[in-house]
Amino acid sequence: MAAPALLLLALLLPVGAWPGLPRRPCVHCCRPAWPPGPYARVSDRDLWRGDLWRGLPRVRPTIDIEILKGEKGEAGVRGRAGRSGKEGPPGARGLQGRRGQKGQVGPPGAACRRAYAAFSVGRREGLHSSDHFQAVPFDTELVNLDGAFDLAAGRFLCTVPGVYFLSLNVHTWNYKETYLHIMLNRRPAAVLYAQPSERSVMQAQSLMLLLAAGDAVWVRMFQRDRDNAIYGEHGDLYITFSGHLVKPAAEL
């Protein structure tokens, strides 16, 4: 009987007749309280206006930009190169680098060509001077590299410049003077001389000359008041003229 009476009383009383009673939101049995967190006391006026959520924290929705970001587009056309800037001052000298590794052995070079020049000629027939000057010709070729010596003219023409050793050997004639010059072009370089004597002897002269390409070396017989001659026999070789390159000019 008491329960129906209380229900009837609650329906008949106006809103706000129970000011002392706190108002709480509905709580479900299987869910957490709603709205969550602390809440403010709701007045009868707010409840009458229907503003049940007054005093509760506001929920502001946010949008994640990363979700809305699209895919990366294609690269654009390369722009023009900008103007070159002014040249800056030189930087400080850097540290010395490490020593590199030893390189590979290179290919073998061409073989070195060594220069040679030599001649050795003789005369078997004796010769008397009749002119003021007379070149001594030769009739026997012993050594004549590259044909540089002309037997008929009695001249050696230098083709390999350098230092040469030259020697002249003759046999004097009894009671006759022997007077010869070793000539370099038109200049006497050395003399070979023997006075008249009742006995014939071997006479020699040697020297070294620096020859250039095109220089000529030859033997000249000189005529004076007395008869000038050199002795020779076909069976023996008494008169010889020789020369060879000691050192080429390229190595001087």
From Swiss-Prot:
This is Complement C1q tumor necrosis factor-related protein 8. The keyword Secreted applies. It comes from Homo sapiens (Human). It is found in: Secreted. May play a role as ligand of RXFP1. The gene is C1QTNF8. Residues 74-109 are annotated as: Disordered. Keywords: Collagen, Secreted, Signal. Not N-glycosylated. Residues 112-252 form the C1q domain. Transmembrane segments: none annotated. Homotrimer. Forms heteromeric complexes with C1QL1. Interacts with RXFP1. Pfam families: C1q (PF00386), Collagen (PF01391). The keyword Signal applies. Its main location: secreted. Residues 69-111 form the Collagen-like domain. Residues 1-17 form the signal peptide. Expressed predominantly in lung and testis. Expressed in astrocytes. One of its GO terms (cellular component) is collagen trimer. GO terms for biological process: positive regulation of cell motility.
